[in-house]
Amino acid sequence: MKEALLTYLNERIDWHKREQTRLRGEYRQDEAAHVQIAINVYNIFLSTYQAMKFDLGETLRRFSSIVSNWDESHRVACEHGDDTKKFVEEIKFARAMEIIQRA
């Protein structure tokens, strides 16, 4: 199961990177930015899975904790415009990586 999940995660990351390149080529920067968020989420999950020594149960608990903190940040960002949204996304990503590194 470990290898299948790792393969799946890496395939999803690769697909999203190709999609992002395509969108940028079509000058659809907003959509490409949303794809970057998806790439970040897959990378965070993958990093968490590796940090938890491939324990899927613990990975899901940690990842759920990380994601639950994003909802409030997203609501605040939506109320304050695009610059704030971008900043909040960067903060969420940095915070998630900090949590993973402490694991």
Where are the regions a protein language model picked out?
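Amphipathic alpha-helical binding modules
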Residues: 70-103
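Generic N-terminal initiation segments characterized by hydrophobic and/or small/turn-forming residues
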Residues: 2-6, 20, 43, 77, ...
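Amphipathic alpha-helical coiled-coil segments
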Residues: 41-57, 95-103
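Alpha-helical segments in soluble extracytoplasmic regions
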Residues: 30-38, 45
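Short linear sequence elements within intrinsically disordered, low-complexity coil regions
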Residues: 13, 32, 47-50, 54, ...
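Charged, low-complexity interaction regions
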Residues: 21-33, 54, 75-88
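Short amphipathic alpha-helical heptad-repeat segments
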Residues: 1-19, 38, 56-72
